[in-house]
Amino acid sequence: MEYKNTLLMPKTEFPMRGNLPKREPAMQEKWAEMNIYEKVQEHTKGRPLFVLHDGPPYANGDIHMGHALNKVLKDFIVRYKSMTGFCAPYVPGWDTHGLPIEQALTNKGVKRKEMTVAEFRKLCAEYAYEQVERQREQFKRLGVRADWDNPYITLEPAYEAQQIKVFGDMAKKGYIYKGQKPVYWSPTSESALAEAEIEYQDKKSASIYVAFPVKDGKNVLEGDEKYIIWTTTPWTLPANLGISVHPELEYAIVKVNDEKYIIASELFETVAKTLEWENAEVVKTVKGSELEYTVAKHPFYDRDSLVMLGDHVTTDAGTGCVHTAPGHGEDDFVVGKKYGLEVLCPVDDKGVLTEEAPGFEGLFYDKANKPITEKLEEVGALLKLTFITHSYPHDWRTKKPIIFRATAQWFASIEAFRKELLEAVAETKWVPAWGETRLHNMVRDRGDWCISRQRAWGVPIPVFYAENGDPIITDETINHVADLFREHGSNVWFEREAKDLLPEGFTHPGSPNGEFRKETDIMDVWFDSGSSHQAVLEERDDLQRPADLYLEGSDQYRGWFNSSLSTAVAVTGKAPYKGVLSHGFVLDGEGRKMSKSIGNIVVPKKIMDQLGGDILRLWVSSVDYQSDVRISDDILKQVAEVYRKIRNTFRFLLGNLDDFKPSENTVAVAELREVDRYMLVKLNDLITKVKEAYETYDFAAVYHAIHNFCTIDLSSFYLDFAKDILYIEGANHEDRRAIQTVLYDVLVALTKLVTPILPHTADEVWPYIPGVTEESVQLTDMPEAVQLDDAEALKTKWDAFMTLRDDVLKALEVARNEKVIGKSLNASITLYPTAEMKTMLESINEDLKQLFIVSEYKLGGMMEEAPADAPKYEHTAVVVAQATGETCERCWVVSETIGKDAEHETLCERCATVVKENYVK
C-alpha cells in the first residue's frame, strides 16, 4: 500500500504565484462586466451616506506616485466604509482648465495667434478630454473603485454653470470687487497668480544699500541727512514713492566723515560693519513716529519720496528704513493707500519697464538691475553692492521668478468673511491635528484672493461693462449666463458679442445707447475646483454637502482645502467638509524629491507592469502616509515578500479546506478544544484591531496586524502544529474538523479584512472559499468579532503557553545546531518549568507533543530540580534528547509502537489505526 496516498495533503486550484500584472487586468474586466460599482451602490442603498469628495487631479500627463498614493488611500476608505454599514459613493473628478494645457498645445506646435480664442479653447478642451481618458485608465488599473463612467470634469457645461452661480452668490453678498492692487505676477505666463501657484526656490539677487537725501526735515531733521534703504530688487526703484519707518523704533542719525545717515538704532552695528564705516558716531536719536511726513529726494528722478509709518518694518535685515513702491508690494500698497500715494507700476505684462521708468524703458525687469545700479553709482547714491542667494517666489509652472505688480484685477474679499472662515476651520476635524493650525494661520494672514487671470483657457468672469465703465453683475445677468453655459458651454462667451450674452431687452442706466462690453479675464483655476462643493456635492443626487471627508496632499492646505473653504463659507456660511485628512509627498528610497535631473522617478505604471497593482496598494498601506513617504525597488521588494506571505496563507487555508463543507462539517464553538478557541480569540482580536485601525485611517496598523497574524499566529504556531492533524488523521476526525472550522472562520474574515487594501487578491480568493454565495467579496460586510465567554481566561493561559513554547523552540534550535537532533520531530523533550508554568501545563488537555511538534514530551520536576547542564530559560529548563524508537513512514513521528501492527509494520500505532479505519476495505 502506498501510504503517501492516505495522507490528506492540501488541495486547491488557487495559484501559488500571484502573476498580478496578468491576472489583475482580467479581474478588472470581470468587475466591469458585473458593473461592480453599481452593484455595491445597489447593495448598500438606504444606508447612511459617507461621502469622500475627490479633489480633482490636473488633467495633464501620466499619473505619478503622488496621484497613486492619493487615489489608493481614498479607495481604502471608500471600500472599508461600504463594508461597514455605509453607502459610500465615490465620484472621481478632473481639473481641466489653466495654463499647463495652453502650454502643452503651444509645445505641440499649435499656432494660437493664427486662430480665434474660441478655436484655441476648443483645442484645449479636446486635449483635456484626452488627458482625462489617459488618467482614468491608469487610475482604474490601480484597482480604484469609482463611478468612472460619470466623473465630474470642471470644463463640462453643467459644472461651469454652477461655478458661475457661486461667483454670482459671492458678488451678491458684496464679496467680489475690482481693484488696482499688487498681485503675484508671472512675466513668463503673463498672468496674475494665486498664492497656491507659487513656489519658493533659491535665486541670486543684487543686494544694494542706497542713500536718499533729505529734502524737508520738518524741523525734526536738519536737511543734510540721508535715509539709507536696502533692497534686493533694484528694478523697483523707478517706482519708489516713499520710505517706511516703524513708529515705535528708535532711529539714529549717524555721522560718518562728512555725511549724516538715518538708520534704525538697533541695526547700527550691522550696517556699520556691512558698509565698512570707521569712526561712525551717533549724533542724535529720534523716534520713528517723529520722522512721519519728512520728505526725501528720489536718488535719480526729480520727485519726492515721502517718509511714512508702517508696522511692517522690522529689524530682521536691512536698515529699518524701507524702500516703498506701492505698485510693487502688498505692504507698500497698504501704506501708500493710507498716505494717498498713487499706485505707480512702470512694468508691463511681459515684465518690461515702460515709459514711466525713464532711462530704463524697454528693459526686461531683471536686466534693468545693472543699469539702475550703475545710475545710482553715477549719482553717488550707491553705498554698497553685493550679491546674495535667497529664497524667492517662482511660478510653479514655468519655474521662473515672479514679481509683485499692481494691476486691475478681480478679487474675492477674504476680509469680509474671515471670521466665519476661522470658525469653519475650528469646527472641522483635522487629521493630522496640525492641519488645523496650518489652515487657521493661512486664513488669518491671507490677503484678499485675486481671482482673475489674463488667459484664454478657463471659465470667463461673468461681468459686463456699461458705456460709462460701470461693471454689471446682477441676479438676472448671472442666471442668464449660467443658463447659456449650461446649454452651450463657456465657449459661448468667446463666440458671441456682449449684447448676445445679455438677457433679451436688457437695459442699464450706464448704457444709454444700449452698448455693452464683456470682461475678457478668466477665473483662477482654484475657483474652478473650489466650486466643486456646489457643482458636485450639492448637485448630484448620490452625494451631499458637507462631505464627510476631503483627502489630499499637504500642499492643498493652501490650494483646494483653502479655495473650497473660501467659496463654501462665502456661499453657505459653512465649511464644505466635516473632516480633512492630508498626506505627505512621495520621495525616493534615500528621502530625496523625485526629479528628472536626478533620474530617481518611480512611475506607478512600471510598478504595476512588473509587480502588480496590489503590491503598490500594499506599499501604500505600509507607510506612515501622514508624513513624506519613501519608495524604491528595495522597499517594494520587502512589500512583495509580505504579499507572498499573505498569499501563501490564503493558499494554505484553501488547500486544507478542500473537503470542508461549512453546512455539514462545522464544529460548534463549545465543542472546540481550548487551543482552537484560543485561535478564535486571536482572530477576534485581529478583527477588532484591524477595524479600529481602518476607522482611524491608520492603514499601517492594518498592514502590520495582518502580516503579524499570518506569520506569527498562523504560520509559526497554529498552522504549523495543525498539519499533523490535518494531513494524518482521517477526514472526519473531530480534531481535524475542529481545526478546519477555525481555519474556515480565519479564511473568510481574513479575505474580508484585506479587501480594501488588496481587492484583486481578495476577489481572486473569494470564489474558492467553500459555501460562499456572493458574486464578489465587495458585496459583503466586514467580519464581526465574536466575544467568547472564556476569552480572557483563554488568553491568559495560552499567551503564557506561547511564551513557554518560545523557550522550548530556542532549546530545540540549540540541540539542532549541536547535532543532538536533526529536525524537531526527532526530539524527546523534558521540561522543568516554574511553578506557575507547571500548573498551566498540567491543565492542558491537548496533546502537548503535537503542540511542540516533537515525538515525545515529558514533564519533569520543578525548574530548580533540572539537571545542572540543562539549558535554563525564563519559564523552564529544557532537556532535549533523541526520541527512542523508529520513524513512522507515514507521519514521521519517532515512536516505539512501530511494527506493533503486523499488517502495517512501518507505521506507528496511530497511523495503523487511521489507515485501517479509513483506507482498508
Swiss-Prot record:
Its EC number is 6.1.1.5. One of its GO terms (molecular function) is tRNA binding. Keywords: Aminoacyl-tRNA synthetase, ATP-binding, Cytoplasm, Ligase, Metal-binding, Nucleotide-binding, Protein biosynthesis, Zinc. Binds 1 zinc ion per subunit. One of its GO terms (biological process) is isoleucyl-tRNA aminoacylation. It comes from the Bacteria. SUPFAM superfamilies: Anticodon-binding domain of a subclass of class I aminoacyl-tRNA synthetases (SSF47323), Nucleotidylyl transferase (SSF52374), ValRS/IleRS/LeuRS editing domain (SSF50677). ATP binds at residue 596. L-isoleucyl-5'-AMP binds at residue 552. Its cofactor is Zn(2+). Zn(2+) binds at residues 888, 891, 908, 911. A motif ('KMSKS' region) lies at residues 593-597. GO terms for cellular component: cytosol. A motif ('HIGH' region) lies at residues 57-67. IleRS has two distinct active sites: one for aminoacylation and one for editing. The misactivated valine is translocated from the active site to the editing site, which sterically excludes the correctly activated isoleucine. The single editing site contains two valyl binding pockets, one specific for each substrate (Val-AMP or Val-tRNA(Ile)). HAMAP family: Ile_tRNA_synth_type1. Catalyzes the attachment of isoleucine to tRNA(Ile). As IleRS can inadvertently accommodate and process structurally similar amino acids such as valine, to avoid such errors it has two additional distinct tRNA(Ile)-dependent editing activities. One activity is designated as 'pretransfer' editing and involves the hydrolysis of activated Val-AMP. The other activity is designated 'posttransfer' editing and involves deacylation of mischarged Val-tRNA(Ile). Monomer. This is Isoleucine--tRNA ligase.
